[in-house]
């Protein structure tokens, strides 16, 4: 049996999940964008405007953070913490149902115990003071004291076991590491969720649309993190070490200089060179991932708009600075020695270093996630056009792009129209719409690499509209007008 006094473990577990505003277990826990958790009542008091009753993100939270939470808009229940709170309350109720007697009998019980104990009653009184606040008015009867204490300790151990079982990631089914709370209230390991978002921008549990990983990285649950670090430090350090090794391994990937690929879109490759056969084989043995980038080609005037990459060792790499991580789905060997590789884009990357010593180059990458921040004109590939279209909303941009293609379908240039429904694709994923349109645009592939540099979905739509405008201006007739031949 544990040597710890009854009530200590219960109070310790309970302390991790209480609301800092009212110092009580939250009936409806709300996790803030900073990772702190409060009850719904305290949330409304802190973030609601007194005049309108609407949520106002102008105040800071109870965790003494200096910056206000500009993204606080809803009071979605934190699913995992609500389950943990329910377990704590259930255990609290079960303990209260033990055969206990009122505090008024304390002196009588202590007197009976003192007849055969020395020193008199000291340990019993100390244990009583350490019981949870709910039980301070109760004391075990002297006849069944040891049994009551044993039951109490067993319930505490069972509570810890049940809480740890709830704190499991629904992606890797392991204990949570670096837990991130999604806007829909579900919690996952940070690395697992970031990995899942490369396949689909939806919650793995409820399919709710999720924001950019850059936003989610800040929503790490403070309560769950501190609980797991304190109760399971060895497991936490093991997961941390494993993730750092995996991250270091992922940061250096084989590079295939071939073509342009896009995130969350299928890509098919014909592999016939021996060195790339070896590269694909090595990828299949490890993470099944590699980086693909567009090769540089000189323009007709002999100059190159994109300069080659150089590293500290003086080596040069003739490819674009931005590429895409492809994940191999399957490899089909053909009878003529080639291999047909089916892959899918995961996310955009920026090449920050490379090694060109072996059969194929290996590159160190930096993930290029979407952000909610809009680009400034100086950061945008076409600054003068950004000033023209930069103030348009997503809906207005989609309307203009759709109008262009609707007009094109009625002319002799219907062949430039992508075989997709613009508005339907926008409803499904506004972040991927620009990639799907760019993939089918009749412009230079090297020019298309600009889309990988833009990390805001709205700015990407602006860039697509710029390309459509330039494309229309370069034609010898206007879309929507009659074709005349002199």
Swiss-Prot record:
SMART domains: LON, RING. A zinc finger (RING-type) spans 169-207. InterPro entries: Lon_prtase_N, Lon_prtase_N_sf, PUA-like_sf, Znf_RING, Znf_RING/FYVE/PHD, Znf_RING_CS. One of its GO terms (molecular function) is zinc ion binding. Disulfide bonds: none annotated. The keyword Nucleotide-binding does not apply. The keyword Zinc-finger applies. Signal peptide: none annotated. One of its GO terms (cellular component) is cytosol. CDD domains: RING-HC_LONFs_rpt2 (cd16514). Residues 250-472 form the Lon N-terminal domain. Keywords: Metal-binding, Zinc, Zinc-finger. This is LON peptidase N-terminal domain and RING finger protein C14F5.10c. It comes from Schizosaccharomyces pombe (strain 972 / ATCC 24843). The lineage of its organism: Eukaryota, Fungi, Dikarya, Ascomycota, Taphrinomycotina.
